[in-house]
Amino acid sequence: MVEGKMTHTLSRIILTLMALLFVSQLPFFSTHAQETTPNNPIMTDEHPDLLIILSPQYEKDTVIRTAINSYITAVYNDLGWTSRIIPIHEDENTYQQIDNIIETTYNNHSVKACIMVGEDLNTALGGDCDYLEQPSTLPWSTLGGTTTYELTQQGIICKPTTLNICISLLYPTHDLSYEQKKSSIISAFHKFAIQRHTTNQNIIRVFESSDLNTNSKAMYQKLSNHGDISYTEDATDSDISTSLTESYTAYFVHGHSTPAGTDVNAQKNIGWFTAETLDTLQTPFFGADGCYAGGWWSNQQDNNKLDSSIDGCWYGSKIFTSTHIRVMALGLLSQNGFSTPVSFLENVVPELLTGKTLAEAMIGDTCIGDFIIVGDPTFHFTI
């Protein structure tokens, strides 16, 4: 009887040890482990090439996360880039704290690009005038904290600056319903995920006002080194309409601008390129070259503050409604005025047209910083 009891007890001990060993091999799930703090971001990889910053409004939305994860997979399959999602809590939602999170991550591994998702992310002011608002991404695209940019009461000062990270905004209009904004974000990431292979058709369309092109005309025409350029000075509404029947590698408009459009004719009411046109434009890359082209409308006049966008026509919002456009560059793309090239048009576009991703074409370039990127920073042409 004693021997039988000992055998039975020994068997139970062995079974218990085997059970513990089995459990130890299972993945450990913890709701708290998925909480979003800058010290414990959700990891896709320890050394990310791409960061996706989720605003407080969307950080817990599982459907948005699913769309982002599909995009992350597509980017990895296309470029081999690894990614990390970093959600932002309300109590850390200042552009300075977000900058610190980005730079801390960069110090561990050189990040190439960062997509800022959510219009409620606190963003630096680039300028405001009447009801026009212009964000600045310079604090996030540079390294060294406040030592790399100059801040005044009126916003971030634009000056020649070396870009270390490509920052792209994905900001729906503030005053739309949550479901509308959520749907917009999901559809954008879906577009970015499935449109990975874009052939360079070597056709570049440029509409430019003669009122502003003393120096930029030669810059735009120099793009002919990278493809056939169709350049029109002082275009008419008819010219704009005709252009919509064709597809292009890249499409640029340059002139006096607002968030709603660009005057591509020196005479008023002759050639107005409206942002609404982007819904039918057939190009993966669009550039609007002009003041406040990278901004939005608000219901607040000048107050030295970046106010919320209102539902209206503005370039950046069209990334969510355009079928073809993957990424936009909006702002002063051809401004120079320095002894060395510091414009987006001179430094970034030629490299983009040779097959580099937009992010890689921007990294290390010196730019004035008076433009923003909207859309997919991993966009590239298949050469």
Predicted features and spans:
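Cysteine-dependent hydrolase recognition
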Residues: 34-383
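Secretory targeting signatures
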Residues: 1-34
